[in-house]
């Protein structure tokens, strides 16, 4: 996996969540991308990082980097996260005749609680995939 591709995917994914990436964010995104790649390489015992990360772990690595990025922003610049759309969560999906219900405005969670849950999801997503690609270290 090439680091530049991962940074491009991180920027694209952040836009999907309603976050506008600025020039100020570029160094933090690059750092978090390298940190996420190193985490995956250490967990799976890959020798060459990020070159050894297979395509199957690309999105796991990207989501981990985004979780780290959002946690960093929440700590140091929480006002910049107000543009994130955390209200549109899927409540129910019905397969027969396709019926999708969104949980808009439901529940008593605050914006910060929803953000914390979202960050935790991004940082823990893909543990099964990581376990599948783990190598024995001699």
Regions found by a protein language model. Give the residues of each.
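Short loop/turn elements at secondary-structure junctions
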Residues: 67-138
């Amino acid at each position: 996996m090439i680091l530049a591709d991962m940074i491009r995917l991180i920027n694209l994914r952040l836009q999907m969540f309603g976050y506008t990436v600025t020039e100020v964010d570029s160094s933090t995104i690059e750092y978090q991308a390298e940190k996420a790649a190193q985490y995956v390489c250490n967990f799976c015992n890959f020798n060459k990082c990020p070159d050894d990360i297979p395509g199957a772990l690309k999105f796991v690595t990207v989501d981990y980097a985004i979780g780290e990025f959002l946690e960093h922003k929440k700590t140091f610049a929480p006002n910049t996260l107000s543009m994130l759309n955390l209200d549109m969560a899927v409540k129910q999906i019905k397969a027969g005749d396709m019926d999708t219900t969104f949980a808009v405005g439901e529940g008593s969670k605050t914006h910060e609680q929803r953000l914390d849950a979202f960050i935790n999801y991004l940082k823990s997503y893909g543990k099964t995939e990581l376990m599948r690609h783990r190598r024995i270290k001699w």
